[in-house]
């Protein structure tokens, strides 16, 4: 077994003890989360090609400071899919509201990575009183704006065709490297691939509909402190695009040095640091 394969095998072994799964019944729906620590809540929403487990290393770094909760988005992991065939961000935000209610979380620092940024922003827009601070990591803009309708149709068709043609395993093999910088090591690649290989086709299809049918800029929250960060080597949500989104959100922006799109996997220590600062800012009202 290679070093990378050993690494990928070791991290899942850490999950039961360090970031265990918990299943909650939300009405007729089951929702899966991973949870560690206690204190002020920070809630982590993953992107389209990932899952709750991808936050393991960040959770290990934050669990001594906060209650860390990462969901498997609807249709991911052991979370029930949404009822809508073509859900929008507000549908995912509705599930998140039910989850936070079930967990007795009144307020939290809310973190959205990539496509998870749409859900995070939509929730903050609708429930600003429940979000201490909104953190967007390499946020996906979405293709739902009228000016991007043609591009959105093309992206949707290609992603659905790729899924039908090669399946989840094929996508994990072909796309994992795209989520990392050219300098990423084999261990990071193995962990990205492990997470992507566990996608559920139905949940992935619904996430494609969200990506191609909704737009982040339609969900600008009011009165919620926000910050935006992006990997300096992110080739998917490029730094210049994330900087423009930060300007639209009137939010501070920074680069995560040496990280590609999967910043929490490639540079977990830097992501942990910026989220620790966001937690501190939520308590003091200022970023240090």
PLM region descriptions:
Residues 19, 27-28, 32-34, 56-60, ...:
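Active-site loop/oxyanion-hole signature of alpha/beta-hydrolase fold enzymes
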Residues 112, 116, 120:
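Gly/Ala-rich beta-loop-alpha elbow adjacent to hydrolase catalytic centers
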Residues 147-152, 164-221:
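Conserved alpha/beta-hydrolase catalytic His-Asp/Glu region
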């Amino acid at each position: 077994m290679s070093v990378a394969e050993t690494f990928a095998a070791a991290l899942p072994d850490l999950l039961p003890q360090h970031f265990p799964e918990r299943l909650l019944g939300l009405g007729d729906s089951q929702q899966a989360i991973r949870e560690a620590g206690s204190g002020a809540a920070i809630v982590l929403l993953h992107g389209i090609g990932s899952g709750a487990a991808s936050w393991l290393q960040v959770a290990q770094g934050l669990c001594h400071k906060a209650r860390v909760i990462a969901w498997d988005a609807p249709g991911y992991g052991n979370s029930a899919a949404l009822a809508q065939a073509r859900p929008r961000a507000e549908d995912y935000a509705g599930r998140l509201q039910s989850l936070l209610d079930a967990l007795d979380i009144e307020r939290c620092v809310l973190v959205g990575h990539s496509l998870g940024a749409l859900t995070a922003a939509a929730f903050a827009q609708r429930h600003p009183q429940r979000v201490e601070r909104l953190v967007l990591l390499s946020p996906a803009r979405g293709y739902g704006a009228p000016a991007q309708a043609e591009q959105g149709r093309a992206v949707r068709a290609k992603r659905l065709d790729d899924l039908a043609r090669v399946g989840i395993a094929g996508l994990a093999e072909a796309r994992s490297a795209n989520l990392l910088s050219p300098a990423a090591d084999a261990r990071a690649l193995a962990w990205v691939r492990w997470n992507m290989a566990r996608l559920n086709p139905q949940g992935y299809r619904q996430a494609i509909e969200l990506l191609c049918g909704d737009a982040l800029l339609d969900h600008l929250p009011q009165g919620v402190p926000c910050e935006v960060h992006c990997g300096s080597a992110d080739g998917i949500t490029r730094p210049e695009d994330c900087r423009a989104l930060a300007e639209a959100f009137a939010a501070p922006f920074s680069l995560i040095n040496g990280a590609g799109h999967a910043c929490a996997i490639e540079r977990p220590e830097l992501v942990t640091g910026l989220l620790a600062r966001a937690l501190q800012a939520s308590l003091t009202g200022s970023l240090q």
